Every structure is written in C-alpha cells, then in structure tokens.
A protein has these predicted regions:
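N-terminal amphipathic alpha-helix/helix-capping segment at the start of soluble metabolic enzymes
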Residues: 2, 6-44, 269-271, 277-280
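Alpha-helix-loop-beta-strand connector modules within alpha/beta enzyme cores
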Residues: 85-109, 141-148, 197-212, 257-279
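N-terminal small/glycine-rich loop or linker at the start of catalytic domains
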Residues: 26-48, 77-79, 204-213
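Catalytic alpha/beta core domains of metabolic enzymes, predominantly
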Residues: 36, 145-244
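Active-site mouth loops of central-metabolism enzymes
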Residues: 41-58, 82-86, 106-110, 129-130, ...
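Hydrophobic faces of well-ordered beta-strands that scaffold small-molecule active sites
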Residues: 41-47, 69-73, 107-109, 126-128, ...
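Catalytic beta/alpha-barrel core
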Residues: 88, 103-115, 123-139, 147-159, ...
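Glycine-rich, proline-tolerant flexible connector loops at the mouths of alpha/beta enzymes
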Residues: 72-91, 246-256
Length: 280
C-alpha cells in the first residue's frame, strides 16, 4: 500500500485541485437535463460506435425508455487493429447530436485529438479514453474549454496517475471532470479487463470528483455486465456507462459486450433499487 497517497498534506501538495481535502463536498456537474454526482444516479448508455442514423435512433429511443440519463456513441474510435471499424467521424458526431436533441438526452463521445474540438461543439461531454489518459497535451487542451470531461482510467494506471491526469485538466481551469473506472490489465484472460471495485471507495475518499464505472469494457462479455454493474453501484459508484445495441450480432464494434435494450432496462431497474438502499 502506498501510504503517501492517503496523507492529506501530500494529497494537497500533489493534487491541490482534485483532492477532497480542498473540496470536502462532492462535486455535482450539471449536463443539460442531467446532473452527475451527489445524490444523482447517472446511467450512460448507447452503442459503442455510431453506425447509422437508423441504428443510433433505435438504440437512443430504447435506452431513453429504459432510464438512461445520458446517450453515448463513439465516432472517433481508437482501435487496437488498424483494420477495425474506426467510426464515422464528423458524420457520427452530427448524428449523435441530432439523436440527443430528438430524445432529450445529453450526449458523450470520445475525443482523440485536440484538433477535433471544433467538431464536438454540439456534444455535451467529451470523453478521454483509457489509451489517452496520459495524453497530457490533449488533457491540457480540454482543460482550456468548458465542456465536462469524462476521464477513463488507463489500462495500467495507478490511482496516483489517474488523479494526476484529472489535475492536468483542472489546472487549466475546467472544474468539470468525471472519473470512470473501466477495468485494468492483469494476469488473467477470462475477461477483457479486471474491474477494480476497490477504486470506487478509494477514489471517493481521495477526490471530490464523481466516480462512474464502465462494466462493458471491464467484462468484454454481455452476460457479465449486469453483475458487474450491480456490484459497482453497491460499492458506491455514482453511475454506470454501458454499451447497448439493438442487434449486437451485427455491431461493427464490440458487439460481444453490448447489452440488448431489454437487458439494459433490467440493469437500470436493479441499479435504481440498489441506489435507493444506499441513498434512502
């Protein structure tokens, strides 16, 4: 255990803006009709990738009915293979913004390069993916604009490194940072990643920033997402980020870890029940 991490004086020295010591009350981030943090359960849902207007709108309609508070959709996809579908780019952003307006849901999409910022003008939340968690030039650029940033934990990032990345954004003047645990790389290969449930209470003790969990990337398999999602809420997470697709078998990206709308609806209902027990 790194006891230095839990020393308040050291925390204030290394993370003066992110440390809970500097901001004892948890941060609440308003995003359109939603609010992230505090007593608000956040349910982000939608396809891994925007594939077409028909696919996106069908999924958006379904997750809205199921209880989603924010619509997700990937448009610039940093894929492991250069031959994999990498998203629709600017056209995907246009469709995502249109779907957000149609179904009255704030939107979130991953940004991979600061040069793309003008294209994200109509997107409500900018996501920094695990691969870019330590892209400090990107973090600084995002800190100089006002949209909320959803900062995913890197594949092998420590708590300190994750906090430091948040500090990069905060230091540039943007106070709206949301942390998202999405699983880390470990020695086992039975799941896509290993969900670090301990990160939830630990990070909530260290920082005032909201902490969400992405059980889709942690599991890599749709059948395990509900269990991990329920566990995350029970551990104190402020919400979930879940991949949902109306036809996962035909998905162009990560279909194996996408829930059907009806399965997401059941997970959302379970999450609300658990949330109600923790926040009576």
């Amino acid at each position: 255990m790194n006891r230095h991490l839990y020393d308040e004086e050291a925390l204030m020295k290394d993370y003066p803006l992110a440390a809970r010591t500097a901001h004892p009350e948890g941060t609440v981030i308003p995003v359109g009709s939603a609010a992230i943090g505090g007593e608000n359960l956040t349910l982000i849902a939608g396809p891994c990738a925007v594939e077409s207007r028909e696919q996106l709108f069908a999924t958006a309609a379904a997750v809205k009915v199921a209880g989603a508070t924010i619509l997700r959709g990937g448009t610039y996809k940093p894929r492991t293979s250069p031959y994999a579908f990498a998203g629709l780019g600017e056209e995907g952003l246009r469709l995502l913004a249109e779907a957000g307006r149609e179904f009255q849901l704030p939107t979130v999409s991953e940004i991979t390069d600061a040069a793309l910022l003008p294209q994200f003008e109509e997107i409500d939340i900018l996501q920094v993916g695990a691969r870019n968690m330590q892209n400090y030039t990107l973090l600084q650029a995002l800190g100089r604009q006002s949209k909320p940033i959803l900062l995913k934990r890197g594949l092998a990032a420590t708590y300190e490194e994750w906090l430091a990345s948040a500090e990069y954004i905060l230091r540039e003047g943007n106070p709206h940072v949301i942390l998202c645990e999405r699983g880390i790389r470990s020695y086992q290969s039975g799941t896509r990643a290993t969900l670090d449930l301990a990160a939830i209470p630990v990070m909530q003790g260290l920082t005032h920033l909201p902490v969400l969990v992405d059980p889709s990337h942690a599991s890599g398999t749709a059948g395990w997402i509900p269990a991990l999602g329920r566990a995350a809420i029970a551990a104190g997470a402020g919400g979930l980020m879940v991949e949902v697709h109306t036809n996962p078998a035909q998905a162009l990206s990560d279909g194996e870890q996408a829930l059907l709308p009806q399965d997401f609806a059941r997970l959302a209902a379970d999450a609300h029940k658990i949330w109600g027990l923790l926040h009576p």
